[in-house]
């Protein structure tokens, strides 16, 4: 089947020269970003603002999700100084909000949870004012691993459901209920924790299914939601079934807020970490005259 042509509202230019400085720093510190690995269409905008989502635990994923462009090979050993390097980058960039994520590492005993916790601790030690957001895998339902991450006290803990239950075959090795349980367990472990999830639209989901997932997330105590358009990385990946109009994204945002979410980012180019700083600002607005 021939791919659906992208509409005008999804024509976004990537300008490599605009983020040469950021890429130089990442290369110097031997760091990866999901912006690069997942071929994010927002890379020029975010790198131009000196914002990035750091990818820890290497560049290689142990799962074979049909929507994702992150490398799927034999994972390499962990970099011993990775957490310290991320903290150094946060300090040098003067970041007020940082997002940390990783590929899924089912080959590691704790799924990489200890590295997440170490990274948070390292960032806190050199840049205590920085808000730290984690976007974690499911750790195969290992709640001890999850507890190690929760105990590191991130400002936001994210885990993406990605799509509706009927389409979960695109998420190799994942389970819808397990992902929901992870978000609920995190809130049980730390009732005041801000939790977040993201969904891709255009995979073939029905509107009623989308609203049902929103209800499930709210029942799991998830207060933050991101909705964005799925874009197939190549012809080898799961094909786009529909390009959702910007007006519909806005309607979904209004619906989600009415249902009870604290903050929602919903637009074609929204990704989990896009405008990440907005979520906490909606809960803790700056004093009048600032921001």
Swiss-Prot record:
Q: Which UniProt keywords apply?
A: 4Fe-4S, Cytoplasm, Iron, Iron-sulfur, Metal-binding, S-adenosyl-L-methionine, Transferase
The keyword Protein transport is assigned to this record: no
Tell me the SMART domains matching this sequence. Elp3
The Gene Ontology terms for molecular function here are: 4 iron, 4 sulfur cluster binding; lipoate synthase activity; metal ion binding
Query: Quick check: keyword Cytoplasm in the entry?
Result: yes
Per the UniProt entry, the Enzyme Commission number(s) are 2.8.1.8
Q: Which cofactor does it need?
A: [4Fe-4S] cluster
One Pfam family named in its UniProt record = Radical_SAM
What Gene3D superfamilies has UniProt attached to this entry?
A: Aldolase class I
- Every copy of the Radical SAM core domain together lies at 47-262
What is catalyzed by this enzyme? [[Fe-S] cluster scaffold protein carrying a second [4Fe-4S](2+) cluster] + N(6)-octanoyl-L-lysyl-[protein] + 2 oxidized [2Fe-2S]-[ferredoxin] + 2 S-adenosyl-L-methionine + 4 H(+) = [[Fe-S] cluster scaffold protein] + N(6)-[(R)-dihydrolipoyl]-L-lysyl-[protein] + 4 Fe(3+) + 2 hydrogen sulfide + 2 5'-deoxyadenosine + 2 L-methionine + 2 reduced [2Fe-2S]-[ferredoxin]
Q: Which family does it belong to?
A: Belongs to the radical SAM superfamily. Lipoyl synthase family.
Protein name (database record): Lipoyl synthase
The organism that produces this protein has a lineage beginning with: Bacteria, Pseudomonadati, Thermodesulfobacteriota, Desulfuromonadia, Geobacterales
